[in-house]
Amino acid sequence: MAAGFLKSGDLGPHPHSYGGPHPHHSVPHGPLPPGMPMPSLGPFGLPHGLEAVGFSQGMWGVNTRKQRRERTTFTRAQLDVLEALFGKTRYPDIFMREEVALKINLPESRVQVWFKNRRAKCRQQLQQQQQSNSLSSSKNASGGGSGNSCSSSSANSRSNSNNNGSSSNNNTQSSGGNNSNKSSQKQGNSQSSQQGGGSSGGNNSNNNSAAAAASAAAAVAAAQSIKTHHSSFLSAAAAAASGGTNQSANNNSNNNNQGNSTPNSSSSGGGGGSQAGGHLSAAAAAAALNVTAAHQNSSPLLPTPATSVSPVSIVCKKEHLSGGYGSSVGGGGGGGGASSGGLNLGVGVGVGVGVGVGVSQDLLRSPYDQLKDAGGDIGAGVHHHHSIYGSAAGSNPRLLQPGGNITPMDSSSSITTPSPPITPMSPQSAAAAAHAAQSAQSAHHSAAHSAAYMSNHDSYNFWHNQYQQYPNNYAQAPSYYSQMEYFSNQNQVNYNMGHSGYTASNFGLSPSPSFTGTVSAQAFSQNSLDYMSPQDKYANMV
């Protein structure tokens, strides 16, 4: 006892001022001096290091050499108090340190050192985290895709894998589409989309989750596709479409449509149908458009208000009038066209995304150029636009009826100009109404929208189609659902809005700045105009 006492209390080298409830030693010495609450763990404490040396030299502090302070171990309670203070401030002033030191029975110097060490630890952790993040990001960049298409493909794979419980085809097709995206953007995409259509039937069970996953993947892909020019978007769309967004009913009808009508229909049917079911996926959106063109889908969900199209139109005017946008949006919107055009007939079948891909550049361009050349007469442009929704036009003569352009193609009016009033039967929308209504019905226009928003380029086709269809959108009163009904699919709307900066309240209703936001703030493109050729900068397609 005496030894423990002397050691802890009397030895100069070991002042107890350091130790609060537990002295500097991890294992307290023998019975602590009177003021020390901690019980001793051993009669004389466990001598360690210098302590033992000090003892050997003399019981009464003969060792005058200043000994090193023992490492302080903090109790859990002390650490809790210190951590709480550290959470509030990393640099407590002297008063705070003293207050805490009193509270936890430690010398202020220990508190100060603890804070210094804690800050160093925090910096180290941040540094490690940044390094790991940079490593992971570099890996993603290299592996996930030197090309955006890679990223989109990975996104698609993700969505597919989510869906893949239902349809392994989904994964294959979408991943196939993605992989082929760059090299054989058109064929690969169309194939993948086709598979998507086929597998969508299988995926139906996964539809919702798959659709969501597909949508997410599509969104990612779309964002990247903006960079990759549709290729990734297509695959993403295909993946999303096949991703199980299809509903079995839609799938079946779509597939049937594929069988009977233009490849466009089929592609839309396959991809679109599946999409209709899972309005979430961007691919579904595109496919939905195709399906719409084919008028195959029975889903009456969302007739698209003319205005809703206008935002898209703004985006639509992409430079890639043909090939590129054709492939991605064409897949969706172009899918329909492909069938009539005959360009992507086979390809279009799958998702409709592929369809767009196959569409010839002329066809893709034709809707816009033709319309423009024709003086904006929808009818005139329509037959050319068959590439985009030719099948729809063919099957539905109403599409051809001159609905009048929503806004003259040449119009230089600002992008923000809302499309024709949303009035269901606005004459302008007459031609479009029929087409769009059907597309909306069959293809969840919102899905289409999401696809459109998903990728600027791809959306071009899609929107182009939309534009074409759009005039007819109001033509069919029966097909046209009320604005509210249109928005009833809030999921879709919000989803689209997330990408385009529209708000549900203003989506198709008003030419608010959010409209402009589409160009400036759209998630899919920082500067959508960069993708547009001068003639395409009539953002006001609608």
Curated annotation (Swiss-Prot):
Main localization of the protein described in the UniProt heading: nucleus
Alphabetical list of SUPFAM superfamilies matching this protein: Homeodomain-like
Residue ranges flagged as DNA-binding region: 67-126
Annotated Low complexity bias: 11-21, 124-141, 148-194, 243-267, 406-417, 425-441
Gene3D superfamilies: Homeodomain-like
Keyword annotations of the record: Developmental protein, DNA-binding, Homeobox, Nucleus, Repeat, Transcription, Transcription regulation
Alphabetized GO MF terms: DNA-binding transcription activator activity, RNA polymerase II-specific; DNA-binding transcription factor activity, RNA polymerase II-specific; protein heterodimerization activity; protein homodimerization activity; RNA polymerase II cis-regulatory region sequence-specific DNA binding
CDD domains named in the record: homeodomain
Transmembrane helix listed as a keyword: no
Domain notes: Contains multiple repeats consisting of single amino acids (e.g. Gly, Ser, His, and Asn) and pairs of amino acids (e.g. Gly-Val).
Function: Transcriptional regulator involved in pattern formation and cell determination in the embryonic CNS and larval imaginal disks. Also later in development to coordinate the expression of regulatory and structural genes required for photoreceptor cell fate in the ocelli. Has a dual role in the terminal differentiation of subtypes of photoreceptors by regulating rhodopsin (rh) expression: essential for establishing the expression of rh genes in the pale subset of ommatidia as well as repressing Rh6 in outer photoreceptors.
UniProt protein name: Homeotic protein ocelliless
Species of the source: Drosophila melanogaster (Fruit fly)
